[in-house]
């Protein structure tokens, strides 16, 4: 059965495994997940568990958010997402902790990648630059726009533009360690987003 939890990326570090090898890990804080709503086939046409994470400060709360959270006896949450899974074993108001996952499990992590602003074709797409000798006037431009005949640039041409700031999912990352007391998950490798950004951790679609 698919599982999921919401969290905040704290940053990266490294730990040693049993073989004495260094393993790079990302630390994700997951303490404070609450089941706000259960979606069922009868009422919504599909099954899902709605999770809330991160409290909204009092001055930012509105009546709809207070009313929705009150049904779960919780405070309004800043980050609310659904996990498509069976609702069996879940109750409204239930707290989801880090031990929903175990060390060795594979997960998919979704987050918003770091925004890089407007970037050129070399940085954005990894293209090669032109000759840098003084005889050349072609250095970091995007290259040919295509053939003359269509009188237009084809869709998909790799050009300068906004880089980063997109929703990205990294698949099949291993859960290296689960710290229930401190509400932390240590995931092998890097995950999308800047420090203190919100992420969604779900059971791997392809791996498990």
Swiss-Prot record:
One of its GO terms (cellular component) is cytosolic large ribosomal subunit. GO terms for biological process: translation. The keyword Ribosomal protein applies. GO terms for molecular function: rRNA binding; structural constituent of ribosome. Keywords: Ribonucleoprotein, Ribosomal protein, RNA-binding, rRNA-binding. Residues 117-149 are annotated as: Disordered. Belongs to the universal ribosomal protein uL3 family. HAMAP family: Ribosomal_uL3_B. One of the primary rRNA binding proteins, it binds directly near the 3'-end of the 23S rRNA, where it nucleates assembly of the 50S subunit. This is Large ribosomal subunit protein uL3.
